[in-house]
Amino acid sequence: MIDLQLNGYKGVDFNGDGVSTDAIRRACLAYRADGGHRLLATVITDELSTMAARIGRLAAAHREDPTVRDVMAGIHVEGPFISPEPGYVGAHPARHVRPATVAAAETLVAAGEGLVRSRTLAPGPGARVAGELQVNEGRCSRATTTARPPRGRGGAGSRRVAG
């Protein structure tokens, strides 16, 4: 089993401030013992600097610990470029949701030391440019949105067919 969005496991919160390499290793060992194989450790919306620090701790644990390296296939960054609207923001703190910028996206990716494998963002101001950054890296995931496609044009995931 591969879990593409795991916020923590068996009492270890990957979004906890100061989570240690030892705690991350314990979570990985428990995940394996319960039948899991690989996972993407997920960091959710918060202040940009807080998210970067959390991503950095996960990357450091991956670099320092062979068990973590074996289990954690990478990092999934969920937010902060998501919709702040009720019903869409989910469990994310709406006060930390922000429009996407390439600089902010690059800050989060750099903190991951090459381990950011997936990012979730919603359409909105700056999302096209930040999304192109994802596509150029060869990875992209979708988020729900309140956006509606213009009349006569396809929605998310559609493509124009010649003919």
Where on the chain are the PLM-derived regions?
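Metallo-beta-lactamase
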Residues: 2-6
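Divalent metal-dependent hydrolysis catalytic cores, especially in the metallo-beta-lactamase
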Residues: 7-13, 25-54, 70-84, 112-126, ...
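Active-site mouth loops of central-metabolism enzymes
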Residues: 8-22, 90-98
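Generic structural signal for well-ordered alpha-helices
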Residues: 28, 52-59, 105, 130
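Short acidic, glycine/serine/threonine-rich loops at helix termini
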Residues: 51-53, 85-91, 130-131, 152-154
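A glycine-rich helix N-cap at a beta->alpha junction
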Residues: 60-62, 66-72
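Histidine/acidic residue-rich metal-binding segments in metalloenzymes
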Residues: 61, 97-163
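Flexible glycine-/small-residue-enriched beta->alpha junction loops
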Residues: 78-100
